[in-house]
């Protein structure tokens, strides 16, 4: 009977896959541009790719096949990133509303340049706060609530039109 030497090629390949999957999950969890739901979806994909790669390694018959399965598995796991659409879309929507509001402010009749600038500053401050709130949000629900509140705040900003009407009023009264 022939004695077949023990080999660690498959075990080592599977260990490399496990380590890569663990690293990728850490990277996914650290992605602040993704919501919890988007991260969970990416982690599921990593787990699926890990199981598939280890199965391919198990089913390989030669060292070359094992190495090919390992390389393909590592590459597949490495390419899995969470979607960042939720936060990206929310920021874009808020930014669009802020730009619309700035146009409206600049077209306010009887507002002085100073009054328009003061309102513009409030919109920009609201926009900056909104982006920060979106960045700090974890769940899709938190992102959506933050977006809704931020848009309402930004849309409520109007110039305090006082100087020109007051001047016109006092001229009218003097006349």
Where are these regions (language model features)?
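Amphipathic alpha-helical assembly segments used for oligomerization, scaffolding, or translocation
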Residues: 1-175
